[in-house]
């Protein structure tokens, strides 16, 4: 269709006569995601996106952040807003306020009610959200005057000549990604008191007419808070802080501290297992590219230090024959399904081992799609313990016939705690996707394009089989490190650049490249061979 030169995507959509129940909120323009403010000056291919798309819900969420920050500064002009971690199907927000003596003022339910009312009013008034472009120097000076030093640090290292920012009724802010065009398009949100802060709840992507279901994640929140305490000590909350440390030659020190923290955490878990009499099996689960395998190997070393001999068991060897494997909605074999495993055999053999009996372990022949006997016999001695890694390891149905007191469960994931700036968080899934892109290319010959294409299917399986059971863990281990993105950047960028503009996956590759652009690189030569990152980068002293 022909449209006037310079018209916005919003105007283009109006001319199409199309309707979208939950949109449009953004669009793919030549396979790059743009906001509805974007102007068309020449021929383009356009695909409008609604709230049921990943890019659409991101734009909606960022706009909610903007409205929340504006409302908070209207009520408490000197406050400091920190958009923090994704938790409990929402986002944790910390609003720092101080009294005249400099003491922190705790957030109360009444404060949150006032903030909610202010946000609701701002949305109901349907204020336009203006998008502006300024030189980066001008943007830096603007945010410096506003006291937004995390944005100043971020933009100082952006390397960009111009910077886009947004204005809402005189309140200016920068966001990594597009926003909606008016506040009135925010049809639904929730705001609740949560651990001395605020939980901002957003619509469900599957059903945008409803808020995402609240899920208690007390153990997950505790892990995030533990890492935040270390970040405060290291003064390393944002990418701007990380870049400054790299620039001043502190990268090696940061690597050493981060690696030591991880090793200390693994050692503490091993010590706890050793002190729990009766534990005969350690189960380790986590989503894709969470570093489960290296976590398992490093834990085995620490168990050995405690006089325990770990015996590895692979859940892959307990697959059912191919003709008994469940199928998904498309009729394909669903190897991620819990019932693709021979659960009765697993429980029978584990209990036999715990009774001191000898068993012959199965081995799965992937070429034939058949379970076979391996000829390998196993009998547990008094100082031996089974270590089992797999996506279903925390699902209680997997070990339903094994007494709980004989099992210790560990959940491993890459929980990114560093922020781009105080109003722009880094999705934990981005960290894992970048790890997987590097690993798939290095060890499996799979392109970044193909990894990105498969990623939604991987995430779907995680949402069904892993995340619902993470709070069942006796211990949680965060495999992400503060410096990590600065190291994997060097290997990830050339792979992402090979995802060309003429394919659908370019939008995600471009988004990741844009985000990595803000981070200064660290040479991987400084990473020790026992590091969990070596599972993805290569050069590990562990055998995989």
Predicted regions and their residues:
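Conserved NTP phosphate-binding and transfer environment spanning the P-loop NTPase/kinase superfamily
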Residues: 277, 399-544
